[in-house]
Every structure is written in C-alpha cells, then in structure tokens.
Amino acid sequence: MKLDKSRKLYAEALNLMPGGVSSPVRAFKPHPFYTARGKGSKIYDVDGNAYIDYCMAYGPLVLGHANEVVKNALAEQLERGWLYGTPIELEIEYAKLIQKYFPSMEMLRFVNTGSEATMAALRVARGFTGRDKIVKVEGSFHGAHDAVLVKAGSGATTHGIPNSAGVPADFVKNTLQVPFNDIEALSEILEKNEVAALILEPVMGNSSLILPEKDYLKEVRKVTAENDVLLIFDEVITGFRVSMGGAQEYYGVKPDLTTLGKIAGGGLPIGIFGGRKEIMERVAPSGDVYQAGTFSGNPLSLTAGYATVKFMEENGVIEKVNSLTEKLVSGIADVLEDKKAECEVGSLASMFCIYFGPTPRNYAEALQLNKERFMEFFWRMLENGVFLPPSQYETCFVSFAHTEEDVEKTVEAVSESL
C-alpha cells in the first residue's frame, strides 16, 4: 500500500502541530493517512487508496460521507448566510424534533461540541443542587475538560494519559469514580458523599464497546434517585444511534439531564444539553448558571443536524443500519470461530468492536485487551481496504451508506488480516 504523500505531509505537520494532529487519536503510528475526500461508505486518501470506513468520523456520519440530502440543505443555507448572532427559527423546529425523541429534555440548549455539552451539564447540576462533587465511571469519556479528565477513555487511554497533566488536584478532588456495571460501588460512594450528579455513558464507547449488564441502568436510576443525585446520560455517541431516542429509550431509563452531539450535528460541530425544566431554568439568561457561545445554535450545524434526523425519521435508517450490522458481526464472528482467533466481537445496534481478548465489562478489563495485536490487525485491515478506528479502545460504526458488498469485503478482509 502506497502512503508516500501521507508520510511527507505528516513529517511537515509534526513541525506545526503537537503530534502533527488536531486531535490525539488521529496520530496512530508510524503515521496516519491523509484523507482527500469521502463519499458514501468510503474515504479516499491523498495517495489514491480507497477504504471502506467504519470510523465514520468517530460516529457522527450515520448517513455516510457527503450525503446528498444534507449537502443540499447546507447549500441552501449557505446562500442565506452562515452566522448571524441572532436566534433563528430552525432552533425552535430542531428543539421540538429532539424533544419528540428525547422527552426527558423538557428544555435544551444548543452548544458547539460534546465536551461543551457535558461541561455545561455538570455546571448546571452543581448549580441546581448546590453541591460540588460529581461521580463519573472509570474509563468513560466526556470530553476534554478538567472535571472529567480522570481515568478518561478514548485518546486519553490510547496515548497512556488517562489523567491529564495541567488539571489541578484541588479541582479533580471533587470528581469521584466508580467501575461500570458495579451498582454496589456506586451505592456506597453516593451514600458516603454529598454528590451533585452522576455522569455516565449508558453504553461505554470509548474504552472499547462495553454494554450495561441486565438492569444495571435501572438500578443506577434507582440509587441516584434514592440519594437525591442527578443522573446525567452522556448520549453523545448513543443519541440517534442505539435508537432514535438513544439509550434512554432503548433501555427504558429516564435521566435528569442528557447530552447529545455527533449524529445530532449531521457531521458539523454541535453539542446539546437539556433535561428537566426546573433544572434547565437555572441556565442564563433565565437563571444564575452562566453558559454562552458565539457559535452556539449556528445555522449550518442546525441545518445539517435537522436534515440528518429528518432523513433518519423518514427512511427507517436505524432499522436498516442495524440489520446490516447484524450481518457484518455475524460474518466476523464466524471468521473468528473458524480461525480459532483469540479475540471476540461485540455489538449493539450499529456499533461494534473486535476485542483482542475477552469481552470487557468495565474499564479495568478493557485495559487487559491486547492493544499491540489490535494495531497489527488495524494495519492489515487498512492494507485490505478497510478503515477501522485506530485504537482498541474506540468503537466501530456502520452507516446508512454501507452496502451488502461492503459487508462481504469486510468479512473477507478480517479473514485475511487475521
């Protein structure tokens, strides 16, 4: 596989940007490839190689690359302008559409990133409860802000820095941690501390793919309510992915606050946080918890997000993508069994992960996965024309643009790569 131009570009980038990239997970060794364009289920690099893409920009592109409906909607909005600094009607229409699928979000606010959404949700929770301490799950990833950079997943774990330097100890002393799928540990920590909120990914997607065990989320809801602790579901990944109403609809659990992103922006930057009206009314200018942003609710992100969700609604996207994912995962599982490979495959909806080791149930078990073997597998898959997220700790995504032919080629690539 020829990657000469990508290699040269990366060498130049190393002198211009830390690690040569704008986000750490993109800096896989010995160098990343540079993308020239994307269309449908594929991306094409600057050296002319084509790849079936299961990274899908780490989740936002549920319709695939350069979807025509989204592209046309953006083109129409561009003719009218792309930033005003005033409210627009689409804010109202999109808010109502989101509430249709996330009724727990009685009021909501548009922001610019998932990180911004979780940061604001935690601030609101602290303001509403008058308490400082929060609880997060070990290995969960809620963005790159100080309160949650403690045993953080995603690129933080991939690059060996789950606890970031530069975060004051006095600040993170208010961030408590519990293992995923351990209701006893959660109960104990909530009973012993004055906690404002528990924030968690209902399905962990940044320490590989880790599913909640039976009734775990319902028990989480019960114990947080008993201790008067707000429950925040970080559905940046699972929102409009696990179901149209996210993991809270899929598992039948209603949080107090929810954060959305990724799919909700249709491939453009977005974050959304919302929840119970009495909590959200504390957000400025209605209340005393300040949050603001120049680009919040910008026309382009709202246009792409609204067009994406409407397309999903009108075309049964989730059902079709889930069905294709089942075929893909079944094919991979057959290959793993035939090869007697020391790895497993797990999935939920249109998310899947190939584990080089036993399927984990928490962060500690995810750390035991063989990340070196995974990266060997990653490069072999790339050579066979398939792009997976370049980390054992990331989740793969299937899109509406993927085809039966893509599935067949991917299963063949897995067989050859192993």
UniProtKB/Swiss-Prot annotation:
Annotated protein name in UniProt: Glutamate-1-semialdehyde 2,1-aminomutase
UniProt subcellular location: Cytoplasm
GO terms of biological process kind: protoporphyrinogen IX biosynthetic process
Pathway: Porphyrin-containing compound metabolism; protoporphyrin-IX biosynthesis; 5-aminolevulinate from L-glutamyl-tRNA(Glu): step 2/2
Keyword Mitochondrion: no
Natural source organism: Archaeoglobus fulgidus (strain ATCC 49558 / DSM 4304 / JCM 9628 / NBRC 100126 / VC-16)
PANTHER family from the UniProt entry: GLUTAMATE-1-SEMIALDEHYDE 2,1-AMINOMUTASE (PTHR43713), GLUTAMATE-1-SEMIALDEHYDE 2,1-AMINOMUTASE 1, CHLOROPLASTIC-RELATED (PTHR43713:SF3)
Alphabetized GO MF terms: glutamate-1-semialdehyde 2,1-aminomutase activity; pyridoxal phosphate binding; transaminase activity
N6-(pyridoxal phosphate)lysine modification, residue list: 262
EC number(s) from the headed UniProt entry: 5.4.3.8
Source superkingdom: Archaea
Family the entry assigns: Belongs to the class-III pyridoxal-phosphate-dependent aminotransferase family. HemL subfamily.
GO CC aspect terms: cytoplasm
Cofactor needs: pyridoxal 5'-phosphate
HAMAP family for the chain: HemL_aminotrans_3 (MF_00375)
Keyword line: Cytoplasm, Isomerase, Porphyrin biosynthesis, Pyridoxal phosphate
Reactions this protein catalyses: (S)-4-amino-5-oxopentanoate = 5-aminolevulinate
